[in-house]
Amino acid sequence: MQFVLVDLPDRVHFYPFSLTRSLTEIRVGIYTIKERWDALLSCESQVFTIPYLQGLYQAPFLEQEDVVSYINATCIPNEAIKKAILNLKEGESLLDEDGKWIASNTKERAIGHILLGDPNAKKTITANFIISAMHLLQINATMIQSDFNQVIANGSSLMVDASNRLICPENIFIAEGASLIGVSLNATEGPIYIGKNAILMEGAGIRGPFVLGEKAVVKMNACIYGATSVGPYCTIGGEIKNSILMGYSNKAHEGYLGDSIIGQWCNLGAGTSNSNVKNTAGPIEIWNQYQKSWDTIGNKMGMLVGDYTRFAIQSSINTGSYIGASANIYG
């Protein structure tokens, strides 16, 4: 059986990250959406996205006529959903209890026909979905814990140098090849995951929940608070709190990053900081690119930053800022 993760029209709620890639590449917790599904299904899934992005993803299923299992990319996977999908027969669909589409087994290739399906061949199950870019920050701590449980069930943590201080070590996992010298890791309030060949320099202090991806670097005296996920090949420093760096991005110097999501291949120049609370402590509005209107989202929000964006040194970013892809920010 081939499994295909599908970007649905509601992908627009994930702007600016959905501008340059499929939702399957969005990171929350330890993994991207695709990595999480692939691990659960024990195979490499394919991606079905909008036309201008489809060329980025190999999709041999489009040239074939076999039955394919299509899966809503925003559905949060678990064993019960996996079992329900594997039990679908050709022509059957799986929905949540509110009628939201989760999966279908069909030879159809037109997404509209896939979503409609046969009204008499639909099964239901309880499911949760990722609904927007800002929702990623709200669920990151929960997803880190869920992913961490899978990691410790399938592997053993690396022993570390005695110069490090580990608080609640049973809640800390350090992957093969990681280097830690003179670091403080406090997992009392949530798990800490350190990926393969990651580097944590002297004096760094980290409180969970926290994820550091493969070959990522934490520089000296960095101060990191949960829930924070740092993707592969990132370099981080300064102070970071409750944020997600998707991967291949740098926030390497002093400055504050809080309640924010940074896309791939971004760079925050030295001294760059964002505000995450208004002086009035009042509600924050952030731009909704899809609806062309302002959404009120609570009293804490930093910035959403699209892929390939660069910040000059000493940039100061307003509360609730929405920055698109490939932007250059000065001041």
Region locations from a protein language model:
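Terminal amphipathic alpha-helical/low-complexity segments used for targeting or macromolecular assembly
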Residues: 1-171, 177
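Structural signal for interior beta-strand "rungs" in well-ordered beta-sheet cores
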Residues: 159-331
